[in-house]
């Protein structure tokens, strides 16, 4: 049995939309590129054809990955998110003692992690350290830049 892919409802919708886009729009675009490249003649030295076939393989691989993820998806129901401790699906405001600043993180499954938008995986060092902790707790986390201390200020949906 495959490992469940933990997703928020928002993450599920994004993956479903990406899958639909790849299956409808991108597949058709690549098929047209392949058709045009074939019209150039000799396929043995046809870089346009090779590029289109590589793009097709990438898209088909991504489609297969998304289908597998969605098949094994376990969606976190917002009603099930408890605010007494940090869990997947909640947003946590922390005070970073190392950098003297407040930061907010949304804890998500690894499939929808987006660190640039402060959506961190439950499997990341910070995500692991925060899971199960309560408001007022202080955690030390080893990150590439060293060890940071985070004090949990607020937990919300």
From Swiss-Prot:
GO function terms (MF aspect): DNA binding; RNA polymerase binding
State if Coiled coil is listed as a keyword. yes
Which terms are listed as keywords in the entry?
Answer: Coiled coil, DNA-binding, Transcription, Transcription regulation
Q: Where along the sequence do coiled-coil regions lie?
A: 12-74
A Pfam family the protein falls into: GreA_GreB
* InterPro entries according to UniProt: GreA/GreB_C_sf, TF_GreA/GreB_CS, Tscrpt_elong_fac_GreA, Tscrpt_elong_fac_GreA/B, Tscrpt_elong_fac_GreA/B_C, Tscrpt_elong_fac_GreA/B_fam, Tscrpt_elong_fac_GreA/B_N, Tscrpt_elong_fac_GreA/B_N_sf
Instruction: State the Gene Ontology BP annotations.
Output: DNA-templated transcription elongation; regulation of DNA-templated transcription elongation
Domain of life of the native organism:
Bacteria
Q: List the disulfide bonds.
A: none
List, alphabetically, the NCBIfam families matched.
greA, PRK00226.1-2, PRK00226.1-4
General function of this protein: Necessary for efficient RNA polymerase transcription elongation past template-encoded arresting sites. The arresting sites in DNA have the property of trapping a certain fraction of elongating RNA polymerases that pass through, resulting in locked ternary complexes. Cleavage of the nascent transcript by cleavage factors such as GreA or GreB allows the resumption of elongation from the new 3'terminus. GreA releases sequences of 2 to 3 nucleotides.
Similarity comment: family membership: Belongs to the GreA/GreB family.
Protein name, per record: Transcription elongation factor GreA
């Amino acid at each position: 049995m495959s490992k469940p892919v933990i997703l928020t409802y928002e993450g599920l919708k994004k993956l479903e939309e990406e899958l639909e886009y790849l299956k409808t729009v991108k597949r058709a675009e690549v098929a047209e590129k392949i058709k045009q490249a074939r019209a150039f003649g000799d396929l043995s030295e046809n870089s346009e054809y090779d590029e289109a076939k590589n793009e097709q393989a990438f898209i088909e691989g991504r489609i297969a990955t998304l289908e597998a993820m969605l098949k094994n998806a376990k969606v976190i129901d917002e009603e099930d998110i408890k605010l007494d401790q940090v869990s997947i699906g909640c947003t946590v405001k922390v005070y970073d003692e190392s950098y003297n600043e407040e930061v907010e993180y949304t804890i998500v499954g690894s499939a929808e992690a987006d660190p640039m938008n402060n959506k961190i995986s439950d499997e990341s060092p910070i995500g692991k350290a925060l899971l199960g902790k309560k408001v007022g707790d202080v955690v030390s986390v080893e990150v590439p830049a060293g060890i940071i201390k985070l004090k949990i200020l607020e937990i919300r949906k």
